[in-house]
């Protein structure tokens, strides 16, 4: 007698280029335990959600009933013939093993590995061969006594605590994994999928203590609200558009269709058919990127409301003219209120409706791709929306230990304040429960959705140090080592899944731990799998860091005296930038939000009014900072507005009042600065030597405020010479380096050129002969020169 066990591998994603998918298990060909794992091919099939599933049935002898077996999935894809597809590690903080297991039993059910949970939760299409496709609603609420699906009045888009706004309630049934499900056929109110598209809904959850709560669908693709108003449970009779998105109803959406601004609907494959035109290609290596950091909400100059994705679509022409090949958006997933940076996400699949929603995000991506610009999204997984009363907070229980989305240690009675068991991590909210697969999959699956459905090219993860290094107990600040360990496990699972889905994704992290594992492989190793980490010390040495010991070159130059500058300290940061770093002269955090910070042009003159001669110095030093960033061996990035010499502070609480007219200034007072940026970007992108990681720094002089560094690759050689001296070296500055040889060097770039607004001090684009490693060159005040070896 045998016991047949079905094994299933489900990605939750369409048309992944997986091949040779194989089941590997700790048994021999007869089904007996073996240390030499067998490998058998799995058959590709299609599940009812319309996605690939790989299936195999394996017979085991019944005399092995009770035996513990282990298994996993191996697959191939273009460029890699054998990849281990189990992304998540065992729920043991001391183990990094990636495998699944079961005890053989008579009548055992299917053993399934879900790479992502797309299609398992939310409102999803159910394909039917003999009728119109149905719909399935599914919600994770393991502690609930009961859950009802509540359909809402689309003219209101909100359900009050007393049920006002509901038009139908539908019973849901519980599954063994804590899901609650309702689908077509369960109730007359559940029609076919297409008929349900656009329907607003919520869940009425009876918690474990019997209390009732209305909850949004955490896996929804759209929240109906596009405004700021929170009824706070009271009856609401206003417009759905005025509601704050996280508090409003979720909406059934069809990810296989795109709604254009005109209202016309297109099949996704039709919409994306002209994604790449005229032979334009996207960059495919992180080192080839020049990243423009953009906050959509800070666009819309001249309007009272925050900027939208429509404004961003218009802005792409500016990005294209500037020459950048990547744009990084501050978080665009659903967040509270309109005027917000977006770092408190409530619904990770839904682009903020106030910004235009998911279909507008797709349009933005397509317009960028048509111009050869990759799109990177900033995502925040270290905390949830702090005002998550209808989202993650206390979703199905008021018991702190059963607050399913949040990490909690011990019992409420252990602390003077019952909240003491939550985890602080130097973010604006408590840490997620990273030891729970449903929580991990919320982050993993939403990222997979953005890649597969919205064609996103990469991600920047906000403050990953908060996930794997900073966790402490809220009660007393004790280290929460288990929370940190599972945070690291989550990050590895996330990067592994992304690499399986799309190996060429750009994966960067804001991380200040200096942990080398951050940029070591995760899919083929035990690292955390990121391409690069943000390098804050580059900015701190180059521009400023209030109270810090770093060089702060521009800040100290801004005093206007002749003090020495620690160019040597910046040289160390410049050298380190070659080690898998994203470097920036400014980021969103550094333009005024942090104490002592401000726009580069303001820091460069020590907060003096940027007018007249002072403006000339502000711009000269700003051009120096731009050149150091864009010519470094790191991956360069700068924040919106730097290219026009923006001066107004960019702060969390008043960015709307301080928006800069970037498009207007580009043809006005910012024309010289933008011309300099444009030429620097072209030099950075089109010269392999500049985009290589190769750097040598043969000359640093703190008293003279001079630095020179060499960039090279495959026969190309460039010498970059920068000076922050307040006077030019008009009679020449002698550079010594054996790297200069006896060769001829041609000046190909000068930040002090008239066309950039400079004083035009330099070598006139001439050629200078080095002799025995010595080269004499005229250096401008607060300027940067680039020479090419001939």
What are these regions (language model features)?
Residues 481, 489-653, 685, 692-695, ...:
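Conserved alpha/beta catalytic core and glycan-binding cleft of carbohydrate-active enzymes
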Residues 230-296, 548-614, 765, 771-777:
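Glycine-rich phosphate/pyrophosphate-binding loop
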